[in-house]
Regions:
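Short, well-ordered loop/turn sites that connect or cap secondary structure elements
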Residues: 62-65, 125, 160
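A short beta-strand element within beta-rich, extracytoplasmic domains
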Residues: 69-71, 123-134
């Protein structure tokens, strides 16, 4: 029976709280996936809340026609947008989800979504930990991950703070946002233009009765 351990530590104001918490279940798994840097640009056309055009900062941006991307800006992210016909530094897009696009002239980061194969049944999940890890401890970029069933229908989506693990201790009382059909894959991206990231996932789940 696999076991995961996580720790909670809070200190200050003359007090200290520290606890190691072990969790066990019938099964579990791990994923570590490299996420390349995003590319800088400017929103130069805002047609509606999820349609527009970005002018990339350089011609070697690598964003291609038909790519599936997440778009980041200060205070928001729109995920699962589809890129139209790319011409030079001009990148049109449509169909994103999440936050409404900002105003014209806003600096943005365009990041191609990376596929992560999973075998995760949220209904039997007991603990899930996730972290967007950067070697640069000063990195502050927000990143994003979306979980899907085989439909593909969205099961859950999360914003990820740089180098800040999130732990869903479901057996310990945390809300389970991953319930529904089994999760077969996720798409994640990197909101930083300077530092590559490693997405880390650890989870435990009990066997279905």
């Amino acid at each position: 029976m696999p076991t995961l351990n996580y720790s909670v530590a809070v200190s200050g104001l003359g007090g200290n709280i520290a606890q190691n918490i072990p969790r066990s279940a019938d099964g579990g798994s791990i994923r570590e996936v490299s996420l390349p840097v995003g590319k800088a640009g400017t929103l130069t056309t805002r047609t509606d809340v999820n349609t527009g055009q970005i002018t990339m900062a350089s011609g070697g941006h690598g964003i291609t026609t038909g790519a599936n991307v997440d778009i980041y800006w200060d205070g928001g992210v729109q995920y699962n947008a589809t890129v139209g016909t790319v011409v030079g530094t001009t990148v049109p897009f449509d169909g994103g989800e999440g936050d409404d696009l900002p105003t014209n002239g806003t600096d943005v980061v365009v990041s191609v979504r990376q596929l992560i194969s999973l075998d995760l049944d949220g209904d039997s999940l007991t603990l899930l930990a996730i972290n967007q890890k950067y070697s640069n401890n000063l990195e502050t970029a927000i990143s994003h991950i979306t979980f899907y069933d085989s439909g593909p229908n969205e099961i859950a989506e999360l914003d990820l703070q740089a180098n800040t693990p999130q732990v869903f201790d479901i057996i310990g009382g945390a809300t389970n946002i991953f319930t529904g059909n089994p999760i077969v894959n996720a798409f994640a991206s990197n909101g930083s233009t300077s530092d590559a990231a490693t997405l880390q996932l650890l989870w435990l789940q009990d066997s279905t009765p």
